[in-house]
Amino acid sequence: MIDNILFDLIEREAKRERENIELIASENFVSSDVRQAVGSVLTNKYAEGYPSKRYYGGCSVVDDIENLAISRAMELFGASYANVQPHSGSQANMAAIMSLIKPGDKILGMELSHGGHLTHGSKVSFSGMFFDAYSYGVSRDSEMIDYDDVKNIAKACRPNLIIAGASSYSREIDFKKFREIANEVSAYLLCDIAHTAGLVATGFHNSPIDVAHLTTSTTHKTLRGPRGGLILAGKEFNTMINYNNKERTLDSAVNSCVFPGTQGGPLMHVIAGKAVAFKEALNKEFKDYISRVIENTKAMAEYFISEGLRIVSGGTDNHLFLVDLSGLGITGADAEKILESVNITLNKNAIPFDSKNPSVASGIRIGAPAITSRGLNRDDSIKVAHFIIRALKTKSTDELRKIKQEVIGFISSFDMP
């Protein structure tokens, strides 16, 4: 029996995606091959454990699939080790953190309101509940990471683990400087490249793989794969560490912390989708795509600046940027609602040293991965920025209706992947 109610809802979502300009920096559109893999019969298979070490029979095919995903991930990032089982970036971070340190140890991560992530020490996350969390932020003047300040904080709190990475920071992060700081205070270094993995894989950003003890990522966002997580290691993969009161290699500790430590059976259909996405990212076309993402992001940021709006840190080096809306006299929450009414989707976002509650926020976050996947170029991206400014400045309901129709007509001319 066909579930008409559910499939009608899915079709409504497909229509929404076709007719909306998608600017949420953490979202993207996967290929039909990725969707086919994720929607395959592999969803039927339980496969607790790892290839050749399963707790169930009938795993020979999924062993080959997981090994394929692992080998492609290692090739893509130049890694010596990869675990493709984490269900999400947050679960990848949980496993990575808990393989390196124990509950009660000290973590130093980027302040959430300055661009960090919940799993980097926020009190509402496991990382802040189970660990003694400290934070670093950006300079009030430059709104960029001040590495001397990070060093001073690290010397003061002596963390067991330093986390480098962000969810709303528009500048390239110097992972080598973070490793120097970690070495100085005898801390482990975890680099979270969930947002910039596509830029790292294609060489547009420096790679932390052989710099950090562990690197984590999501497999969606700029990697354009299915929603999921990934843990990588470079030359530190066989470093001996104390895990659960036993001396073992880092890769072995991570494997144990993913399963059985924090997860049960892996999602084999999603791992297959990851394998497809890694293969796609190894092609030259993907590097061209990331180049266009960066170009489109910079074009939008520059247009906002030319129209008198302030961009946090003055610009962007990656796939996203933050707009301070204080000059327009509206909040991020206001802007999110206004723009959704004209079929432009993005999110409200706190800006550094924001005086407003995060649920209201003074800014918005804008990203170009999804629109670039639909084929928008630099000029198209500037047009998108123009739509946004028109919508945020108008006081006319009729004008908003007009903008919505223009947006639908414009974005509908671009195919979905």
From Swiss-Prot:
Subcellular compartments: Cytoplasm
GO molecular function per UniProt: glycine hydroxymethyltransferase activity; pyridoxal phosphate binding
Biological pathway: One-carbon metabolism; tetrahydrofolate interconversion; Amino-acid biosynthesis; glycine biosynthesis; glycine from L-serine: step 1/1
A single BP term in Gene Ontology: tetrahydrofolate interconversion
UniProt catalytic activity: (6R)-5,10-methylene-5,6,7,8-tetrahydrofolate + glycine + H2O = (6S)-5,6,7,8-tetrahydrofolate + L-serine
Gene3D superfamilies named among the record's database cross-references: Aspartate Aminotransferase, domain 1, Type I PLP-dependent aspartate aminotransferase-like (Major domain)
EC numbers, comma separated: 2.1.2.1
Cofactor: pyridoxal 5'-phosphate
Keyword entries, A-Z: Amino-acid biosynthesis, Cytoplasm, One-carbon metabolism, Pyridoxal phosphate, Transferase
Xref: CDD domains: SHMT (cd00378)
Top-level taxon: Bacteria
Gene Ontology terms: cellular component: cytosol
Marked site: Plays an important role in substrate specificity: H220
Amino acids binding (6S)-5,6,7,8-tetrahydrofolate: L112, G116, H117, L118, E247
Enzyme class (EC, first level): transferase
Pfam families: SHMT
Main location: cytoplasm
Modified sites of kind N6-(pyridoxal phosphate)lysine: K221
Subunit structure: Homodimer.
The protein's role, per its UniProt record: Catalyzes the reversible interconversion of serine and glycine with tetrahydrofolate (THF) serving as the one-carbon carrier. This reaction serves as the major source of one-carbon groups required for the biosynthesis of purines, thymidylate, methionine, and other important biomolecules. Also exhibits THF-independent aldolase activity toward beta-hydroxyamino acids, producing glycine and aldehydes, via a retro-aldol mechanism.
Family per similarity comment: Belongs to the SHMT family.
UniProt protein name: Serine hydroxymethyltransferase
Organism: Borrelia duttonii (strain Ly)
